[in-house]
Protein backbone atom coordinates (compact mmCIF):
# COMPACT_ATOMS: atom_id res chain seq x y z
CA UNK A 1 0.00 0.00 0.00
CA UNK A 2 1.33 3.43 -0.96
CA UNK A 3 2.11 5.94 1.81
CA UNK A 4 -0.31 8.85 2.23
CA UNK A 5 0.75 12.47 1.81
CA UNK A 6 -0.87 15.88 2.14
CA UNK A 7 -0.34 18.32 -0.75
CA UNK A 8 -1.15 21.95 0.05
CA UNK A 9 0.17 23.59 -3.12
CA UNK A 10 -0.80 23.36 -6.77
CA UNK A 11 1.60 21.37 -8.93
CA UNK A 12 1.99 21.06 -12.71
CA UNK A 13 0.09 18.05 -14.03
CA UNK A 14 3.19 15.97 -14.74
CA UNK A 15 4.61 16.55 -11.25
CA UNK A 16 1.27 15.77 -9.64
CA UNK A 17 1.18 12.53 -11.63
CA UNK A 18 4.69 11.69 -10.43
CA UNK A 19 3.68 12.33 -6.83
CA UNK A 20 0.55 10.22 -7.21
CA UNK A 21 2.54 7.34 -8.70
CA UNK A 22 4.37 7.03 -5.38
CA UNK A 23 1.76 8.12 -2.85
CA UNK A 24 -1.91 8.40 -2.03
CA UNK A 25 -2.28 12.17 -2.29
CA UNK A 26 -4.84 14.30 -0.45
CA UNK A 27 -4.98 17.80 -1.92
CA UNK A 28 -5.95 20.65 0.40
CA UNK A 29 -6.01 24.43 -0.13
CA UNK A 30 -4.05 25.32 3.01
CA UNK A 31 -3.14 24.23 6.53
CA UNK A 32 -5.78 26.24 8.36
CA UNK A 33 -7.59 24.72 11.37
CA UNK A 34 -10.75 24.49 9.26
CA UNK A 35 -8.96 22.51 6.55
CA UNK A 36 -7.31 20.20 9.08
CA UNK A 37 -10.65 19.53 10.75
CA UNK A 38 -12.34 18.83 7.40
CA UNK A 39 -9.61 16.33 6.47
CA UNK A 40 -8.79 15.05 9.95
CA UNK A 41 -8.42 11.42 8.92
CA UNK A 42 -6.06 12.25 6.04
CA UNK A 43 -3.90 14.45 8.25
CA UNK A 44 -3.71 11.82 10.98
CA UNK A 45 -2.58 9.14 8.53
CA UNK A 46 -0.24 11.21 6.33
CA UNK A 47 3.44 10.28 6.32
CA UNK A 48 4.39 13.15 4.02
CA UNK A 49 3.61 16.85 3.66
CA UNK A 50 4.39 18.99 0.61
CA UNK A 51 3.76 22.68 -0.08
CA UNK A 52 5.04 26.15 0.72
CA UNK A 53 4.43 29.36 2.68
CA UNK A 54 2.18 27.87 5.38
CA UNK A 55 3.21 27.67 9.04
CA UNK A 56 4.19 24.20 10.21
CA UNK A 57 4.51 24.14 14.00
CA UNK A 58 4.14 21.84 16.99
CA UNK A 59 0.36 22.28 17.03
CA UNK A 60 0.08 20.99 13.45
CA UNK A 61 2.42 18.10 14.17
CA UNK A 62 0.12 16.96 16.97
CA UNK A 63 -2.54 16.49 14.29
CA UNK A 64 -0.13 14.45 12.14
CA UNK A 65 1.22 11.62 14.33
CA UNK A 66 2.33 9.50 11.35
CA UNK A 67 4.33 12.28 9.65
CA UNK A 68 7.85 11.26 8.61
CA UNK A 69 8.86 14.00 6.15
CA UNK A 70 7.88 17.54 5.16
CA UNK A 71 9.01 18.98 1.83
CA UNK A 72 8.85 22.71 1.16
CA UNK A 73 8.91 24.27 -2.31
CA UNK A 74 11.42 26.89 -1.18
CA UNK A 75 14.95 27.34 0.05
CA UNK A 76 13.82 29.26 3.14
CA UNK A 77 12.19 27.39 6.00
CA UNK A 78 11.64 29.99 8.73
CA UNK A 79 7.92 29.10 8.69
CA UNK A 80 8.81 25.62 9.96
CA UNK A 81 9.46 24.79 13.60
CA UNK A 82 12.64 22.83 12.92
CA UNK A 83 13.11 21.93 16.58
CA UNK A 84 9.62 20.46 16.79
CA UNK A 85 10.18 18.48 13.59
CA UNK A 86 13.55 17.23 14.76
CA UNK A 87 12.18 16.21 18.16
CA UNK A 88 9.78 13.88 16.35
CA UNK A 89 12.49 12.74 13.89
CA UNK A 90 10.59 14.25 10.96
CA UNK A 91 12.80 15.16 8.00
CA UNK A 92 12.49 18.70 6.61
CA UNK A 93 13.44 18.91 2.95
CA UNK A 94 13.98 22.13 0.94
CA UNK A 95 15.17 23.28 -2.50
CA UNK A 96 18.45 25.19 -2.01
CA UNK A 97 20.20 24.50 -5.31
CA UNK A 98 17.71 24.99 -8.15
CA UNK A 99 17.00 28.69 -7.58
CA UNK A 100 20.53 30.01 -7.09
CA UNK A 101 21.10 31.56 -10.51
CA UNK A 102 17.61 33.06 -10.76
CA UNK A 103 17.81 34.76 -7.36
CA UNK A 104 21.25 36.10 -8.27
CA UNK A 105 19.67 37.56 -11.43
CA UNK A 106 17.05 39.26 -9.25
CA UNK A 107 19.74 40.74 -7.02
CA UNK A 108 21.63 42.10 -10.01
CA UNK A 109 18.37 43.49 -11.36
CA UNK A 110 17.85 45.36 -8.09
CA UNK A 111 21.38 46.72 -8.19
CA UNK A 112 21.00 48.01 -11.75
CA UNK A 113 17.41 49.22 -11.50
CA UNK A 114 18.01 51.12 -8.27
CA UNK A 115 21.32 52.65 -9.33
CA UNK A 116 20.04 53.81 -12.73
CA UNK A 117 16.58 54.76 -11.40
CA UNK A 118 15.14 52.71 -14.25
CA UNK A 119 11.61 52.26 -12.90
CA UNK A 120 11.28 55.89 -11.87
CA UNK A 121 12.41 57.37 -15.18
CA UNK A 122 10.40 54.83 -17.19
CA UNK A 123 7.27 56.04 -15.40
CA UNK A 124 8.21 59.63 -16.18
CA UNK A 125 8.45 58.74 -19.86
CA UNK A 126 4.99 57.13 -19.72
CA UNK A 127 3.66 60.24 -18.00
CA UNK A 128 4.81 62.40 -20.92
CA UNK A 129 7.60 64.16 -19.02
CA UNK A 130 10.24 63.40 -21.66
CA UNK A 131 9.92 66.51 -23.77
CA UNK A 132 13.53 67.15 -24.77
CA UNK A 133 17.09 66.44 -23.77
CA UNK A 134 17.21 64.99 -20.26
CA UNK A 135 19.03 66.78 -17.46
CA UNK A 136 20.67 65.73 -14.19
CA UNK A 137 17.33 65.14 -12.49
CA UNK A 138 17.03 62.04 -14.73
CA UNK A 139 20.51 60.71 -14.00
CA UNK A 140 21.41 57.69 -11.93
CA UNK A 141 24.80 56.42 -10.83
CA UNK A 142 27.29 53.97 -12.30
CA UNK A 143 27.44 50.33 -11.30
CA UNK A 144 30.65 49.26 -13.06
CA UNK A 145 33.82 49.43 -10.98
CA UNK A 146 31.86 50.24 -7.81
CA UNK A 147 32.50 48.18 -4.68
CA UNK A 148 29.95 45.48 -3.91
CA UNK A 149 29.61 44.26 -0.33
CA UNK A 150 27.90 40.89 0.09
CA UNK A 151 26.60 39.94 3.53
CA UNK A 152 26.21 36.17 3.37
CA UNK A 153 28.49 34.35 0.92
CA UNK A 154 26.49 31.20 0.22
CA UNK A 155 25.44 29.81 -3.16
CA UNK A 156 23.49 32.93 -4.11
CA UNK A 157 26.19 35.29 -2.87
CA UNK A 158 28.75 33.43 -4.96
CA UNK A 159 26.54 33.64 -8.07
CA UNK A 160 26.04 37.38 -7.49
CA UNK A 161 29.78 37.88 -7.05
CA UNK A 162 30.37 36.14 -10.39
CA UNK A 163 27.99 38.53 -12.17
CA UNK A 164 29.42 41.59 -10.49
CA UNK A 165 33.08 40.66 -10.96
CA UNK A 166 33.03 39.46 -14.55
CA UNK A 167 30.11 41.53 -15.84
CA UNK A 168 30.74 44.87 -14.15
CA UNK A 169 34.36 44.82 -12.93
CA UNK A 170 33.19 45.38 -9.37
CA UNK A 171 35.58 44.81 -6.45
CA UNK A 172 33.92 42.35 -4.03
CA UNK A 173 33.89 42.55 -0.24
CA UNK A 174 32.11 39.90 1.77
CA UNK A 175 31.19 39.00 5.31
CA UNK A 176 30.22 35.49 6.32
CA UNK A 177 30.67 33.00 9.14
CA UNK A 178 33.84 31.70 7.49
CA UNK A 179 36.23 32.50 4.67
CA UNK A 180 35.08 31.38 1.22
CA UNK A 181 38.10 30.20 -0.74
CA UNK A 182 36.25 29.94 -4.07
CA UNK A 183 35.06 33.56 -3.87
CA UNK A 184 38.55 34.73 -3.03
CA UNK A 185 40.27 32.71 -5.75
CA UNK A 186 37.77 33.26 -8.59
CA UNK A 187 36.64 36.82 -7.93
CA UNK A 188 39.45 38.23 -5.77
CA UNK A 189 36.81 38.79 -3.08
CA UNK A 190 38.09 40.20 0.20
CA UNK A 191 36.78 38.91 3.51
CA UNK A 192 36.20 41.64 6.09
CA UNK A 193 34.24 42.33 9.24
CA UNK A 194 30.75 43.76 8.86
CA UNK A 195 31.71 47.29 9.92
CA UNK A 196 34.44 47.48 7.28
CA UNK A 197 32.11 46.14 4.61
CA UNK A 198 29.45 48.72 5.47
CA UNK A 199 31.94 51.59 5.45
CA UNK A 200 33.65 50.72 2.16
CA UNK A 201 30.84 49.35 -0.04
CA UNK A 202 28.93 51.33 -2.65
CA UNK A 203 26.30 48.58 -2.76
CA UNK A 204 25.47 46.53 0.33
CA UNK A 205 23.65 43.30 -0.58
CA UNK A 206 22.18 41.20 2.22
CA UNK A 207 21.55 37.54 1.40
CA UNK A 208 20.93 35.93 4.78
CA UNK A 209 18.42 33.42 6.11
CA UNK A 210 16.26 34.44 9.05
CA UNK A 211 17.46 33.03 12.36
CA UNK A 212 17.51 34.26 15.94
CA UNK A 213 21.02 35.57 15.28
CA UNK A 214 20.19 37.40 12.03
CA UNK A 215 16.88 39.00 13.12
CA UNK A 216 17.32 42.80 12.78
CA UNK A 217 21.03 42.26 12.14
CA UNK A 218 20.93 45.38 9.96
CA UNK A 219 19.54 48.33 11.90
CA UNK A 220 20.11 52.01 12.67
CA UNK A 221 23.69 51.48 13.80
CA UNK A 222 24.59 49.65 10.59
CA UNK A 223 22.96 52.24 8.32
CA UNK A 224 24.93 54.99 10.08
CA UNK A 225 28.14 53.20 9.10
CA UNK A 226 27.31 53.15 5.38
CA UNK A 227 28.31 55.78 2.86
CA UNK A 228 25.70 58.45 2.21
CA UNK A 229 25.94 57.39 -1.44
CA UNK A 230 25.39 53.71 -0.58
CA UNK A 231 22.60 51.66 -2.13
CA UNK A 232 21.17 48.94 0.11
CA UNK A 233 19.84 45.70 -1.39
CA UNK A 234 17.89 42.99 0.46
CA UNK A 235 16.74 39.77 -1.18
CA UNK A 236 17.27 37.40 1.73
CA UNK A 237 14.61 37.66 4.41
CA UNK A 238 12.76 40.83 5.37
CA UNK A 239 13.12 40.63 9.17
CA UNK A 240 16.91 40.48 8.88
CA UNK A 241 16.56 44.25 8.47
CA UNK A 242 14.93 46.63 10.93
CA UNK A 243 12.54 48.16 8.41
CA UNK A 244 11.78 51.24 10.52
CA UNK A 245 15.50 51.95 10.74
CA UNK A 246 15.80 51.53 6.96
CA UNK A 247 12.93 53.95 6.37
CA UNK A 248 14.54 56.50 8.70
CA UNK A 249 17.92 56.13 6.95
CA UNK A 250 16.31 56.71 3.55
CA UNK A 251 14.22 59.66 4.73
CA UNK A 252 17.18 61.38 6.38
CA UNK A 253 19.56 60.82 3.48
CA UNK A 254 21.79 58.62 5.61
CA UNK A 255 21.90 56.23 2.64
CA UNK A 256 21.13 56.99 -0.99
CA UNK A 257 18.60 54.35 -2.05
CA UNK A 258 17.32 50.82 -1.53
CA UNK A 259 16.30 47.90 -3.72
CA UNK A 260 14.09 45.45 -1.85
CA UNK A 261 12.55 42.10 -2.71
CA UNK A 262 11.66 41.13 0.87
CA UNK A 263 9.99 42.92 3.77
CA UNK A 264 9.21 42.45 7.44
CA UNK A 265 5.53 42.10 6.58
CA UNK A 266 4.52 40.49 3.29
CA UNK A 267 2.61 41.61 1.32
CA UNK A 268 3.96 45.07 2.09
CA UNK A 269 1.39 47.25 3.83
CA UNK A 270 -0.30 49.73 1.50
CA UNK A 271 0.53 52.57 3.89
CA UNK A 272 4.25 51.74 4.13
CA UNK A 273 6.41 54.84 3.61
CA UNK A 274 8.60 52.73 1.32
CA UNK A 275 5.89 52.89 -1.34
CA UNK A 276 6.08 56.67 -1.61
CA UNK A 277 9.86 56.98 -1.84
CA UNK A 278 11.35 57.62 -5.27
CA UNK A 279 14.67 56.19 -4.10
CA UNK A 280 13.19 52.77 -3.33
CA UNK A 281 12.61 49.89 -5.73
CA UNK A 282 10.14 47.48 -4.10
CA UNK A 283 9.49 44.07 -5.67
CA UNK A 284 6.89 41.51 -4.49
CA UNK A 285 9.36 38.81 -3.37
CA UNK A 286 10.05 37.65 -6.93
CA UNK A 287 13.53 36.26 -6.19
CA UNK A 288 12.90 32.84 -7.73
CA UNK A 289 9.73 33.74 -9.61
CA UNK A 290 10.33 32.60 -13.16
CA UNK A 291 8.32 29.87 -14.87
CA UNK A 292 11.38 27.70 -15.30
CA UNK A 293 12.73 27.99 -11.79
CA UNK A 294 9.39 27.59 -10.02
CA UNK A 295 8.83 24.40 -12.02
CA UNK A 296 12.29 23.13 -11.10
CA UNK A 297 11.68 23.95 -7.44
CA UNK A 298 8.42 22.01 -7.44
CA UNK A 299 10.11 19.07 -9.17
CA UNK A 300 12.90 19.14 -6.61
CA UNK A 301 10.39 19.21 -3.74
CA UNK A 302 8.54 16.20 -5.18
CA UNK A 303 11.79 14.26 -5.56
CA UNK A 304 12.85 15.30 -2.07
CA UNK A 305 9.68 13.85 -0.56
CA UNK A 306 10.01 10.62 -2.54
CA UNK A 307 13.61 10.25 -1.40
CA UNK A 308 12.88 11.10 2.23
CA UNK A 309 10.04 8.61 2.53
CA UNK A 310 12.36 6.01 1.01
CA UNK A 311 14.83 6.75 3.78
CA UNK A 312 17.27 8.89 1.75
CA UNK A 313 17.96 12.29 3.32
CA UNK A 314 21.47 12.65 1.91
CA UNK A 315 20.54 15.72 -0.15
CA UNK A 316 18.50 18.85 0.59
CA UNK A 317 17.65 17.88 4.18
CA UNK A 318 17.63 20.67 6.77
CA UNK A 319 17.91 18.35 9.79
CA UNK A 320 19.62 15.11 8.66
CA UNK A 321 21.23 14.38 12.04
CA UNK A 322 17.85 14.43 13.77
CA UNK A 323 16.29 11.82 11.53
CA UNK A 324 19.11 9.30 11.18
UniProtKB/Swiss-Prot annotation:
EC nos: 1.1.1.79, 1.1.1.81
Keyword Cytoplasm: yes
Keywords: Cytoplasm, NAD, NADP, Oxidoreductase
Alphabetical list of PROSITE patterns matching this protein: D_2_HYDROXYACID_DH_2, D_2_HYDROXYACID_DH_3
Cited InterPro entries: D-isomer_2-hydroxyacid_DH, D-isomer_2_OHA_DH_cat_dom, D-isomer_DH_CS, D-isomer_DH_NAD-bd, Glyo/OHPyrv_Rdtase_B, NAD(P)-bd_dom_sf
Enzymatic reactions: glycolate + NADP(+) = glyoxylate + NADPH + H(+); (R)-glycerate + NAD(+) = 3-hydroxypyruvate + NADH + H(+); (R)-glycerate + NADP(+) = 3-hydroxypyruvate + NADPH + H(+)
SUPFAM superfamilies: Formate/glycerate dehydrogenase catalytic domain-like, NAD(P)-binding Rossmann-fold domains
UniProt keyword NADP, yes or no: yes
Cellular localization per UniProt: Cytoplasm
Active site residues per record: 237, 266, 285 (proton donor)
Top-level EC class as recorded in UniProt: oxidoreductase
Coiled-coil regions listed: none
Main location: cytoplasm
Superkingdom in the source lineage: Bacteria
HAMAP family per UniProt: 2_Hacid_dh_C_GhrB
Record text on subunit structure and interactions: Homodimer.
Its biological purpose: Catalyzes the NADPH-dependent reduction of glyoxylate and hydroxypyruvate into glycolate and glycerate, respectively.
UniProt protein name: Glyoxylate/hydroxypyruvate reductase B
Organism: Cronobacter sakazakii (strain ATCC BAA-894)
Gene (name only): ghrB
Amino acid sequence: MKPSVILYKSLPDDLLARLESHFNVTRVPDLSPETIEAHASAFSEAQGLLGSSEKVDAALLEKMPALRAASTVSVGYDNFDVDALSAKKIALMHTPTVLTETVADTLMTLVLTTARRALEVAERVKAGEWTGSIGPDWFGCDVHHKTLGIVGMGRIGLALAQRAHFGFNMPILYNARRHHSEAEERFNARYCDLDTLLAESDFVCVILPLTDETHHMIGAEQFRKMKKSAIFINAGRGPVVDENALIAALQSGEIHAAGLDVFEQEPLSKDSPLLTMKNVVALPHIGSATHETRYNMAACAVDNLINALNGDVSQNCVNPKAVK
